[in-house]
Amino acid sequence: MDRTETRFRKRGQIKGKITTSRQPHPQNEQSPQRSTSGYSLQEVVDDEVLGSSAPGVDPSPPCRSLGWKRKKEWSDESEEEPEKELAPEPEETWVVEMLCGLKMKLKQQRVSPILPEHHKDFNSQLAPGVDPSPPHRSFCWKRKREWWDESEESLEEEPRKVLAPEPEEIWVVEMLCGLKMKLKRRRVSLVLPEHHEAFNRLLEDPVIKRFLAWDKDLRVSDKYLLAMVIAYFSRAGLPSWQYQRIHFFLALYLANDMEEDDEDPKQNIFYFLYGKTRSRIPLVRNRRFQLCRCMNPRARKNRSQIALFQKLRFQFFCSMSGRAWVSREELEEIQAYDPEHWVWARDRARLS
């Protein structure tokens, strides 16, 4: 009995050891067990078929948000766009600066990358149809735009005026001494024979004849001022047959503005142009008489005519592109076209 009891007790102890060894340890549950197949745990998980996840588990990746997704799409689109070609750097070339016998001096010059198509694009942006205004458009801008459209239509209806070309400059020989030559820059005059013919035709006008006969002191119409009239005819750009009496007095008035300091003598042009003389207008300083005269409809008409003359004078000045100054050489060249003309005898130096 004792031997059998001891055997059963030993067997019970062995079974207890086996059962205790098979119970899972809390630390061993958390640590992953090695697979009996010899593969790592990561490889076994990748081979498993994904099923429905647990209700509390988020299947989305942890660090991917909506902003990251948009950023990724934007980066993909930017990679697909072709790269813009940058403008080439300006090249430099060597040009001949001076050549003396067999010696040659070179100079490094940069080639400009500007092409004619760039000028065309720039000029197209300056066309009247281009809108240079900012995007914020107000009511005042709308009125201004409507006025601009109306002015464009009126300009299209009216024929465009052809302005006179700018005078060119040439080099002429002033002095020649042996192998040395002295050059002088000279401006080519734009005065043509047709301008002289238009001037001579206007001298036959009875009003202009009367005006020149009245100016005995040559304070308004000496030979230089009359030569400036011909120069202005060449710069205004009108055909010779279009010059009338008003153009003669406009040019003469503008010539007096440029050369004379006294303002009173040229005011007589108004009275000869509109059929009156200076002697018919009384010079009375009585304010009451002047007030009654201002209320006279004839006086108001005279003021409106003078205002119209000043407006035409400004238009005539603009038609010459503001080139109202005439050099002494050009005036002498105009007089040399027909030196025997009776107009060139109107010299102030002979009167004194």
Swiss-Prot record:
InterPro entries, per the entry: Speedy
Biased composition (Acidic residues): 76-90
GO molecular function annotations of the record: protein kinase binding
Composition skew (Polar residues), residue ranges: 18-40
Positions of region (Disordered): 1-90
Family: Belongs to the Speedy/Ringo family.
Record protein name field: Speedy protein E16
Organism: Homo sapiens
